[in-house]
Amino acid sequence: MAAALRRGYKVLRSVSHFECRAQHTKPSLKQEPGLGFSFELTEQQKEFQTIARKFAREEIIPVAPDYDKSGEYPFPLIKRAWELGLINTHIPESCGGLGLGTFDACLITEELAYGCTGVQTAIEANSLGQMPVIIAGNDQQKKKYLGRMTEQPMMCAYCVTEPSAGSDVAGIKTKAEKKGDEYVINGQKMWITNGGKANWYFVLTRSNPDPKVPASKAFTGFIVEADTPGIHIGKKELNMGQRCSDTRGITFEDVRVPKENVLIGEGAGFKIAMGAFDRTRPTVAAGAVGLAQRALDEATKYALDRKTFGKLLVEHQGVSFLLAEMAMKVELARLSYQRAAWEVDSGRRNTYFASIAKAFAGDIANQLATDAVQIFGGYGFNTEYPVEKLMRDAKIYQIYEGTAQIQRLIIAREHIEKYKN
């Protein structure tokens, strides 16, 4: 483990029993004789959860409203998360990282999102940017680009979406042409999280101009240094929610990239880009659950304090039933991301469960944020109270990393295919 990470863990409590090895990061749905599985977390998972929870409640929540209003990038919080080992959790131990599984990353993500999903998204975007390198990079690429992120707080970004190609990834127009030992990239990317803060990018390009070539062979993925000549970073976008997250457009104009920065080889980019989602969609779902849990907690506390018609809100059946519905939804959404994470950590293809988790948790986050505002009444519509921010922040969970509708297409395809086979 990197020295900085060791120092970070000592900040909150002694965790000398942490060995941070992959075999110690099994999901909570572990096999038990006679029962089949258990919901009990390992001691290490409980430690990670405690550290993340303490950080979110004591350091993120107090400043989240200010970051939301200013739109300032939360680098002090990101640096602190890096010191505590709550960022770059997927990076292999061979590159100086913790080598945690998806399940463990989800536990951390839920806690961070409870504090502020804008901060959590800035952190989680690193995992998305890193994932193509983690699953498809060679040893040299991993050590060079992942290793540097364990040495100091550093960001990366996943550059796939374009102005005219969001859900239709196969419709991207950014091109890469091979010229000698280099590739020349030209095109534009849009809505790139960490776009203006990244040290390097994963960039998906069309390397075969023939429209008849299938997507599985037409695209190539590159690692591109952010300071490469020809890269032009656009203005920071002012979004409806998650405002402290850095979202920008990026233009590539005759950007030269060495052939050593190709992941796997020409034509492998589409599979790499899509494969990354199987590992990151569970954590996105976990972020949505963190927001949903916050909405439930805020609504419940308010209903226990606010009186109307001579009694507490919770004493009105309509409100208590609404809280019950909210509680059911958040518990089921949590189980959905845990199942998706458990599947991939167990070495199984989890596309079906990852899409279920992403779609369901994203919808639940929006429903619970709306319900929380309703319970707060007029106060919920005011910026002095936390739930209006939750409602604004929640919407993006139905859009980024695959819209709610795209997830349903994937779920339907996977479901029907099972019956065909």
From Swiss-Prot:
The modification N6-succinyllysine is found at residues 69, 179, 212, 217, 259, 271. Acetylated. Could occur at proximity of the cofactor-binding sites and reduce the catalytic activity. Could be deacetylated by SIRT3. Octanoyl-CoA binds at residues 167, 216, 278, 281, 349, 351, 401. InterPro entries: Acyl-CoA_dehydrogenase (IPR050741), Acyl-CoA_DH_CS (IPR006089), Acyl-CoA_Oxase/DH_mid-dom (IPR006091), Acyl-CoA_Oxase/DH_mid-dom_sf (IPR046373), AcylCo_DH-like_C (IPR036250), AcylCo_DH/oxidase_C (IPR009075), AcylCoA_DH/ox_N (IPR013786), AcylCoA_DH/ox_N_sf (IPR037069). Pathway: Lipid metabolism; mitochondrial fatty acid beta-oxidation. It comes from the Eukaryota. One of its GO terms (biological process) is medium-chain fatty acid catabolic process. GO terms for cellular component: axon; cytoplasm; mitochondrial matrix; mitochondrial membrane; mitochondrion. The active site is at 401 (proton acceptor). Residues 1-25 form a transit peptide. Homotetramer. Interacts with the heterodimeric electron transfer flavoprotein ETF. This is Medium-chain specific acyl-CoA dehydrogenase, mitochondrial. The lineage of its organism: Eukaryota, Metazoa, Chordata, Craniata, Vertebrata.
